[in-house]
Amino acid sequence: MQLIDSHTHIYGEEFDEDRDEMLARATEAGVGQMVLPNVDVASYPRVLELCAAHPERLFPTIGLHPTYVKEDYISQLDYMERELSQRPHVAIGEIGLDYYWDTTHQREQIEAFERQLHWAAKLDIPVILHIREAFADAFETLRRVNLPQLRGVFHSFTGTREELEEALSFPSFYVGINGVVTFKNSTLKEHVASIPLERLLLETDAPYLAPVPKRGKRNEPAFLPHTASFVASCYELTDDTLITKTSENARRLFALPKY
């Protein structure tokens, strides 16, 4: 079973010089399909172009990342809502709340988050959630919108044990784990194995957060086996067992075709 990178930004300019080689390295490393979340209107055409070139391997999502919620957020959302009807997307994302860098637009972030959650519910596709320093508001928003059919993933999860327990209280949501779990100062390794295996996804979030022993380098999908191996050790499982299960999970959540 090949690995599925459930969250990667390989359409970014960081890969413009060696994108084909990077994809070849991913293949060699056993990484097959990948989900490509966009972050704003400007990034969306790049996502579409790359996915169109590899339609059985790369899959687009659409959404407004919380740190891109600025004064023009309504016009960005209007554009994305129009695009939703033009082609299929495997998810709405990445969306959510991020109070780490800037708290100027908290109200607008919540409004954008709610609107996009309703898109996903209406279209019956999952959401990819980016939550940073904002779990209380995110959980409150998810409960307030009260959309029973909503499903998705808490991407790049780095929260506390208590936040993990609350995330898992949403029964149709998975938890995405990336290279952060391998970092020496990460406490995530202490409780990652409490995530039920049937609700675990693996991701790179490339070009960010390269796992040990590649930390400090530009991250890429070929590095995903390092994270997989580390997480497998936390569960006391073989790499193959963990890879098989997480790939099945990703294929089920995003309705990916066999590859």
Residue spans of the language-model regions?
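Mid-domain alpha/beta scaffold segments of enzyme catalytic cores
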Residues: 1-259
